[in-house]
Amino acid sequence: MPNFEQNQVIAVGLSGGVDSSVAALVLKEKGYEVIGLFMQNWETDSKDPFCTAEQDLSDAKAIADHIGIPLYVVNFSKAYWNHVFQHCLDEFAQGRTPNPDVWCNREIKFKSLLDHAKKLGATHLATGHYACIQNENNEYRLLKSNDSHKDQSYFLHLLNQYQLANSVFPIGGYQKSEVRAIAKKRGFINHAKKDSTGICFIGERKFKDFLNEFLLAKPGNIETSEGKIIGKHDGIMFYTVGQRKGLHIGGRPDAGEAPWYVVDKDVKRNVLIVVQGYEHPLLYSQELTCTNLHWIRDTEPSFPLTCKAKTRCRQADQTCVVTRLDNDHCHVQFEHPQRAITRGQSVVFYLGNECLGGGIIN
């Protein structure tokens, strides 16, 4: 984390979780003037049993009081709906699998929230992300966290130079275990609070039930890769490539007991295509194309580019060669076949510890 002048005001996005809480504490103990910002991105009924926003706000207030910083509540639900949620609905409707966290970081946390922090007099916005920012002659690099298991650079790959220049990740150099230990030692009420998982606006409710509230499901056939109908699906928007659960196919006399997996979605025919066995060859691909390219540095890399890539956040880095197709498309050739490459997800590129940027798999 860079050293700033002691009289600078830094705003911290306090979510009620342990990571942002310790991020605020680290800044406070370094002598900065810290203010907390709690985002409300989703309008919910206070009686909604699946929404944790009320408890999260209560935890954020308790932490702010404990540390001794002011906390402001800001509502970005309209911006979130327009710039994140509507985009996700469009992607689901077209049979793709979007990543809301990627868009939320670019459009809400490091845009709307950063702008709000500036209006309050803050010079920078800090969050509890596990990532690092390095300034090299006023060019900002996004680096992986010291905790490889918690690294979140994948979700931050759409950030630009302005956003990185005005952001701080105070716990990027910490291990998650260290963060929890600090929180416990300081008596934070959320020191053992579990990490949030899944899609933020769905919470713990069933994905299918939630999506049904906004999109019209169209049931259709489930076919094998040979074109044989073996079942019915509830709507292809509910499924993603590599998925096993929820197919309700089971073992078949003519196919044995090996489980079935989604291998593709034929949107035009409204057909879900499946194959049998986790290691089925059709679940693997050695190449992909991507669009909506974004490079974090102002100058994009030279092509063809030999680097590492991830097609999902917890995947180990994979060696690949990236080739420019046009201004907005790249071809990615992997050294080894990759399982369950999914349209709508992000492919993110790395050179060593540096996140270069990425694109959307299509």
UniProtKB/Swiss-Prot annotation:
Keywords from the UniProt entry: ATP-binding, Cytoplasm, Disulfide bond, Nucleotide-binding, RNA-binding, Transferase, tRNA processing, tRNA-binding
Role summary: Catalyzes the 2-thiolation of uridine at the wobble position (U34) of tRNA, leading to the formation of s(2)U34.
Gene Ontology cellular component list: cytoplasm
Catalyzed chemical reaction(s): S-sulfanyl-L-cysteinyl-[protein] + uridine(34) in tRNA + AH2 + ATP = 2-thiouridine(34) in tRNA + L-cysteinyl-[protein] + A + AMP + diphosphate + H(+)
Interaction with target base in tRNA as annotated region, ranges: 99-101
Class of this enzyme: transferase
EC number: 2.8.1.13
Annotated catalytic residues: 104 (nucleophile), 200 (cysteine persulfide intermediate)
Annotated site residue numbers, Interaction with tRNA: 129, 345
GO biological process, one term: tRNA wobble position uridine thiolation
Full protein name: tRNA-specific 2-thiouridylase MnmA
Positions contributing to ATP binding: 13-20, 39, 128
Compartment(s) of residence: Cytoplasm
Source superkingdom: Bacteria
Molecular-function GO terms, alphabetical: ATP binding; tRNA binding; tRNA-uridine 2-sulfurtransferase activity
Name of a matching Pfam family: tRNA_Me_trans_C
Stored InterPro entries: MnmA-like, MnmA-like_C, MnmA-like_central, MnmA-like_central_sf, Rossmann-like_a/b/a_fold
